[in-house]
């Protein structure tokens, strides 16, 4: 049994992330960028104008659908999470300052990957028995590639459903409970026995909240995400900017460190001299993927419910999503840490303590502890919401609507389990399946790349179309 567990958490995890996902992200991102004429760069202004530029306009959705904004905030709910805070901190600690450069590179290519995922999701979605729009990799495989390729969609759903209990549930609940404990300990340190009871109470409360929202369907998830995601993101951005500009003299040197060590991690010497280039590249690319999920295909499930007639217009939200998540929020986390001048123990895995120390340079330790704890709590909560939808849709595709209800009940129970138990092995196995999701998704993306290119050409470049 131990050998099987080691295979899933070690060998298979390395193969999935290092030898499959990362090369597919680079090669696939470049290929899709070329086929679609680099619209994430050439039409970036148009994409922002028609996504973030419309955020505060009143939108209404038809039956069985959510507004485009609710769709993107539901997807962002799952992606803007602990990866933006803890993941970015780990990228720097384990890969050096230069890891931020590779995080950016993966995001620039990831914008086109997620654009393609969302575009295909709208193009090949369908109505379920309740009349709701459903879509994602399993549906663009089924309706785009035909019955001989259905095994690819089935594989995706199996991998995603298993991963939802780890990356989308237990790890996030652990973050919430840990954050609440940190916030309480900043004022009233709790004894071990009291902590266990508190964790159980927290788990029950979180499970109840998730249950109320989850059983309300995609519309309720979208309505909650639409309100929570922008608010929590804006507050985090504001406080990060205060720290960065509070150390304004370090902004230039911070960028200098990032670029100087992107290809030569040992350039600055000191504690970072033990970091190899491979570590810098791998941790930058991997943490970018953890943060924005481009290539995993998960966000396409949320976007499929959008009330829109244009696959390309919704696809633009995929570009915005990666930009907001990684280029903006992850970059601000990185600059907050580097500009603050806090000590970094390179080569050692870190949690939230690095970003907490950075915020403490401006706001003091007590406030910083509470703020980071609350930020992690909200980010993790919305991630659970997003992944509860992803897992539910995958189980629905495999077994039907009735069984998806059973999954939802199990998902809520696992929330309580995740609050009181440390299930590192289960989390590590789920992390492996999270990486495996990319395999069927990239098969479909490559096979249907011509469809995306055709839709993009018709929308942006055909002379008989309106000028965009």
Region locations from a protein language model:
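Membrane-interface loop-to-helix entry segments
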Residues: 24-31, 35, 39-48, 173-180, ...
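Helix-loop-helix module between adjacent transmembrane segments
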Residues: 32-33, 106-131, 138, 142-174, ...
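Selective recognition of specific alpha-helical transmembrane segments in multi-pass small-molecule
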Residues: 109-117, 203-218, 229-249, 282, ...
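Alpha-helical membrane segments and immediately flanking helix-loop junctions
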Residues: 59-94, 120-138, 142-144, 155-161, ...
